[in-house]
Protein backbone atom coordinates (compact mmCIF):
# COMPACT_ATOMS: atom_id res chain seq x y z
CA UNK A 1 0.00 0.00 0.00
CA UNK A 2 2.26 2.72 -1.28
CA UNK A 3 1.65 6.28 -2.39
CA UNK A 4 0.64 5.22 -5.90
CA UNK A 5 -1.87 2.65 -4.65
CA UNK A 6 -3.38 5.16 -2.22
CA UNK A 7 -3.84 7.70 -5.01
CA UNK A 8 -5.36 5.11 -7.34
CA UNK A 9 -7.87 4.09 -4.67
CA UNK A 10 -8.72 7.75 -4.05
CA UNK A 11 -9.31 8.35 -7.77
CA UNK A 12 -11.60 5.31 -8.03
CA UNK A 13 -13.69 6.69 -5.15
CA UNK A 14 -13.67 10.28 -6.42
CA UNK A 15 -14.86 9.29 -9.89
CA UNK A 16 -16.94 6.27 -8.77
CA UNK A 17 -15.34 3.99 -11.35
CA UNK A 18 -13.59 0.67 -11.59
CA UNK A 19 -9.98 1.63 -12.23
CA UNK A 20 -7.37 -0.66 -13.77
CA UNK A 21 -3.84 0.63 -13.29
CA UNK A 22 -0.94 -1.05 -14.95
CA UNK A 23 1.63 -1.76 -15.14
CA UNK A 24 2.98 -0.96 -11.70
CA UNK A 25 6.18 -2.40 -10.21
CA UNK A 26 5.47 -4.17 -6.91
CA UNK A 27 8.14 -5.70 -4.70
CA UNK A 28 8.45 -9.46 -4.82
CA UNK A 29 9.96 -11.81 -2.23
CA UNK A 30 13.12 -11.97 -4.37
CA UNK A 31 15.73 -9.34 -3.51
CA UNK A 32 15.87 -6.49 -6.06
CA UNK A 33 13.12 -8.03 -8.21
CA UNK A 34 9.62 -6.74 -8.78
CA UNK A 35 6.33 -7.96 -10.17
CA UNK A 36 4.92 -6.13 -13.17
CA UNK A 37 1.38 -5.74 -11.84
CA UNK A 38 -2.07 -4.60 -12.95
CA UNK A 39 -4.27 -3.44 -10.07
CA UNK A 40 -8.08 -3.23 -10.29
CA UNK A 41 -9.78 -0.87 -7.84
CA UNK A 42 -13.53 -0.80 -7.13
CA UNK A 43 -15.56 2.42 -6.83
CA UNK A 44 -15.33 2.11 -3.03
CA UNK A 45 -11.51 2.32 -3.26
CA UNK A 46 -10.86 -1.30 -2.34
CA UNK A 47 -8.41 -3.37 -4.35
CA UNK A 48 -10.66 -5.81 -6.20
CA UNK A 49 -7.89 -7.93 -7.73
CA UNK A 50 -4.25 -7.81 -8.78
CA UNK A 51 -2.48 -9.59 -11.60
CA UNK A 52 1.28 -10.15 -11.82
CA UNK A 53 2.44 -10.43 -15.44
CA UNK A 54 3.30 -14.02 -16.33
CA UNK A 55 5.20 -13.61 -19.61
CA UNK A 56 8.23 -11.32 -19.31
CA UNK A 57 9.38 -9.49 -22.43
CA UNK A 58 12.81 -10.19 -23.90
CA UNK A 59 13.84 -8.63 -27.20
CA UNK A 60 17.06 -8.25 -29.15
CA UNK A 61 17.10 -7.30 -32.82
CA UNK A 62 20.82 -6.58 -32.92
CA UNK A 63 20.21 -2.85 -32.47
CA UNK A 64 17.82 -2.67 -29.53
CA UNK A 65 17.84 -5.11 -26.61
CA UNK A 66 15.58 -5.34 -23.57
CA UNK A 67 15.17 -8.09 -20.97
CA UNK A 68 12.37 -7.53 -18.47
CA UNK A 69 13.68 -10.47 -16.42
CA UNK A 70 16.65 -8.36 -15.28
CA UNK A 71 14.37 -6.39 -12.93
CA UNK A 72 11.15 -8.38 -12.78
CA UNK A 73 10.00 -11.84 -11.73
CA UNK A 74 7.10 -13.57 -13.50
CA UNK A 75 3.76 -14.05 -11.82
CA UNK A 76 2.24 -17.52 -11.71
CA UNK A 77 -1.53 -17.02 -11.40
CA UNK A 78 -4.20 -16.30 -14.00
CA UNK A 79 -6.52 -13.65 -12.57
CA UNK A 80 -10.15 -12.88 -13.31
CA UNK A 81 -12.56 -10.80 -11.26
CA UNK A 82 -16.25 -10.02 -11.37
CA UNK A 83 -17.42 -6.49 -12.09
CA UNK A 84 -21.17 -5.86 -11.96
CA UNK A 85 -21.93 -9.40 -13.09
CA UNK A 86 -19.28 -9.50 -15.82
CA UNK A 87 -16.27 -11.80 -15.66
CA UNK A 88 -13.14 -9.78 -16.46
CA UNK A 89 -9.73 -11.29 -17.26
CA UNK A 90 -6.51 -9.37 -16.62
CA UNK A 91 -3.28 -9.51 -18.60
CA UNK A 92 -0.32 -7.23 -19.34
CA UNK A 93 1.53 -6.35 -22.54
CA UNK A 94 3.67 -9.28 -23.77
CA UNK A 95 1.07 -11.73 -22.41
CA UNK A 96 -0.84 -10.87 -25.59
CA UNK A 97 1.45 -13.21 -27.54
CA UNK A 98 0.49 -16.31 -25.52
CA UNK A 99 -3.04 -17.52 -26.35
CA UNK A 100 -2.93 -20.31 -23.77
CA UNK A 101 -3.00 -17.73 -20.95
CA UNK A 102 -6.35 -16.45 -22.16
CA UNK A 103 -7.80 -19.93 -22.69
CA UNK A 104 -7.03 -20.79 -19.06
CA UNK A 105 -9.27 -17.86 -18.02
CA UNK A 106 -12.25 -19.86 -19.20
CA UNK A 107 -15.40 -18.07 -20.30
CA UNK A 108 -14.97 -14.33 -19.77
CA UNK A 109 -16.98 -11.34 -20.92
CA UNK A 110 -14.01 -9.05 -21.43
CA UNK A 111 -10.22 -9.16 -21.21
CA UNK A 112 -8.25 -6.06 -20.27
CA UNK A 113 -4.64 -5.58 -21.36
CA UNK A 114 -2.60 -2.50 -20.37
CA UNK A 115 0.54 -2.42 -22.48
CA UNK A 116 3.66 -0.63 -23.65
CA UNK A 117 4.33 -2.41 -26.96
CA UNK A 118 7.39 -1.03 -28.68
CA UNK A 119 6.89 0.77 -31.97
CA UNK A 120 8.49 -2.10 -33.92
CA UNK A 121 6.51 -4.92 -32.33
CA UNK A 122 3.30 -2.90 -32.24
CA UNK A 123 3.47 -2.04 -35.92
CA UNK A 124 3.92 -5.71 -36.78
CA UNK A 125 1.50 -7.46 -34.41
CA UNK A 126 -0.55 -5.23 -32.05
CA UNK A 127 -3.94 -5.12 -33.79
CA UNK A 128 -3.56 -8.61 -35.27
CA UNK A 129 -3.02 -10.23 -31.87
CA UNK A 130 -5.70 -8.21 -30.04
CA UNK A 131 -8.29 -9.17 -32.65
CA UNK A 132 -7.16 -12.81 -32.55
CA UNK A 133 -7.51 -12.98 -28.75
CA UNK A 134 -11.04 -11.55 -29.00
CA UNK A 135 -12.06 -14.13 -31.60
CA UNK A 136 -10.36 -17.09 -29.90
CA UNK A 137 -12.00 -16.34 -26.58
CA UNK A 138 -15.32 -15.05 -27.94
CA UNK A 139 -15.18 -11.99 -25.71
CA UNK A 140 -14.54 -8.28 -25.84
CA UNK A 141 -10.88 -7.35 -25.71
CA UNK A 142 -9.72 -3.95 -24.47
CA UNK A 143 -6.07 -3.34 -25.35
CA UNK A 144 -4.68 -0.06 -24.00
CA UNK A 145 -1.21 0.77 -25.28
CA UNK A 146 1.13 3.56 -24.28
CA UNK A 147 2.32 5.65 -27.20
CA UNK A 148 5.05 8.16 -27.87
CA UNK A 149 8.77 8.68 -27.54
CA UNK A 150 10.46 8.49 -24.15
CA UNK A 151 13.47 10.44 -22.88
CA UNK A 152 15.58 7.33 -23.44
CA UNK A 153 14.64 7.36 -27.13
CA UNK A 154 12.41 4.29 -26.74
CA UNK A 155 9.25 4.51 -28.84
CA UNK A 156 5.96 2.88 -27.90
CA UNK A 157 3.29 2.17 -30.48
CA UNK A 158 0.01 3.49 -29.04
CA UNK A 159 -3.09 2.54 -31.05
CA UNK A 160 -5.30 1.48 -28.12
CA UNK A 161 -8.38 -0.43 -29.25
CA UNK A 162 -11.51 -2.32 -28.28
CA UNK A 163 -12.44 -5.48 -30.21
CA UNK A 164 -15.72 -7.36 -30.13
CA UNK A 165 -15.99 -11.19 -30.05
CA UNK A 166 -16.07 -11.24 -33.88
CA UNK A 167 -12.69 -9.48 -33.95
CA UNK A 168 -14.07 -6.20 -35.25
CA UNK A 169 -12.41 -3.06 -33.93
CA UNK A 170 -15.18 -1.08 -32.24
CA UNK A 171 -13.02 1.85 -31.17
CA UNK A 172 -9.41 2.88 -31.48
CA UNK A 173 -7.18 5.85 -30.85
CA UNK A 174 -3.56 6.62 -31.64
State the predicted function of each range.
Residues 19-26, 58-65, 141-145:
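Short Pro/Gly-enriched beta-strand edge/turn motifs at strand-loop
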Residues 2-21, 96-174:
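CN hydrolase (nitrilase-like) catalytic-core segments centered on the catalytic cysteine
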Residues 25, 80-82, 161:
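Well-ordered beta-strand positions
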Residues 6, 10, 29-106, 119-128:
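Active-site catalytic loop in hydrolytic enzyme cores
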Residues 26-29, 149:
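Short glycine/acidic-enriched loop and turn motifs that connect beta-strands
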Amino acid sequence: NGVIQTELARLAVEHQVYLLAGSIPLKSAIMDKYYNAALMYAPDGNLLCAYNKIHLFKFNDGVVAYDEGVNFVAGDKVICCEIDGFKVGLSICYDLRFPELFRVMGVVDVILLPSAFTYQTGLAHWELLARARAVENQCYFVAVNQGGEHESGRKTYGHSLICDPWGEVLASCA
